[in-house]
Amino acid sequence: VKKRTFLKLSSSLLATPSLSTLANWMADEKLKNWAGNLQYSTTRLDQAKSLQQVQKLVKGYEKMKVLGTRHCFNGIADSTTQFVSLVEMSQVLSLDAKAKTVTVDANVKYGDLATYLDAKGFALHNLASLPHISIAGACATATHGSGVKNGNLATAVAAMELVLANGEVRTLSRAKDGEAFRAAVVHLGGLGVVTKITLDVQPTFQMRQYVYENLPMAQLKEHFDAIESSAYSVSLFTDWQKNRVNEVWLKERVEKGKTAAAKPEFYGAKLATKNLHPIAELSAVNCTAQMGVAGPWYERLPHFRMGFTPSSGKELQSEYFVPARNAVEAILAVERLRDHISPHLMISEIRTIDADSFWMSPCYKQASVAIHFTWKQDWASVKKVLPMIEKELAPFKARPHWGKLFTLAPVTLQSRYEKLPEFKKLMADYDPKGKFRNAFLDMNLFGK
C-alpha cells in the first residue's frame, strides 16, 4: 500500500455526514496486508464513525469483513465483497479505577492504550511482541505475549460489545455471561463486528530486560522449565543452527528490594554487552531498551518500540502451539528439520502462554509453548517446509496461530478444537446466513 493509505483519509472522501464511503478506491491502489504477502480480494471499503453507522452498514451488506491493522498473514480477515474500517472509532471511552477496567473502541491499538493507561497509573498484564496491533484483532485471534503465568491478550477481556448480522447489538461479559462469553472472545471474525472492549487493568509497574547470547541447546533440554520461569516474560530466539539458542530475552518486573544486577552467565549463555535485535545482524534501534535499564511496562514487554516499524515488513510468519509438558520434545522435533528450515528462515521465537478457557483459543485448557517462525518472503518455499514441521509436531496435536500461515488439513485442524462443533452452532445462531464467513473460515472450520 502506498504511504497515502486508506488510514489517512482526506475530507474529500466523505460521502455523507453520516458515512465515510471509500468505495471509489483508486483503481491503481491495491489493498494489502502489513507484510505485503496478501492482496485482499476487494478494494471496496466503507468507514464507520459510530455504533449506529456500524449497525447501518452491517444490515446493508450480504457479506462483509472488518479491515483492522492488517497484521494477519493469511486470509482470516479477507473479503471478496466488502470491507468496513473502524479506524475513526479509536478512542479510550472510560477508565474505572475502582473496578480496575478500561473500556475502549475495538480499533484502539495496544501502544496507544498503553501510554494512556500508564499516565493514569495503570497497566495491562501483557503485550504482544509489537504494539502496533488493534485490541479487537489481537483478541479475536488469541494473539499473545510470553510468560508461564501470563495468559494471551484475550484473557484480559472483561466484556465486549458486538454488532450481529441483523444489526442487533449484543453485549457479553465475564461476570454475567459465563460460557457464552468464553465462547465469543476468540471469535475469529465469525460472530459479528466487535465495537467495544473492556479490559482488566492493574497498577502500573516498571520493568527491565536483559539479553543473553548463545544458550546451549543441551541446557534448554535439561532446564527448559527453569529457564522459562526465570522472569515475568521470556523469549528464546534461534535459527536452529549450531545447537544453540541465539538470544534469550528476560523481561522482569522491577520489585522493591530486589537487586538489579544481572549475572554474567545464564545457563551457559553470556550476558549481552549492547542492545540487540532478535536477528543479531540487524540494528537494534527499533527494539525496546535492554541492558537492565528500567522503564515502563509498555516499553519493555514488546520487543519493538511503538514509534518504529518492527521490521521491513517483507516477511512471512507461522506459529504452532503445543502443550507445555511437550515443549522440549517439540523443540527437538523442529530442530531435526534445521537444514530444511534454515535456508528460508529469518528467526524463530519460542514463548510460553498460560492456559485459558476460550473455546477457539490454541491455549484452551492447556498451558502452551508457541514455536514461531519468521520466514523470508518466499511462500513457494515456505509452503513446502510447513508440512514437514506440522508432521513433526503432529504427535503433540499442535495448533497453529489463527492469524499466521499454516498448511494443516481442515479435518486435522478441526479435530484439535473440542469446542468447534459448539462454536459452529454459535456462528449459525449469531450469523444464520454467513454474512461474516469467508473462504478462510469456510475451509478451516467447515471444510472436509
What are these regions (language model features)?
Residues 2-448:
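Noncatalytic alpha-helical scaffold of FAD-dependent oxidoreductases
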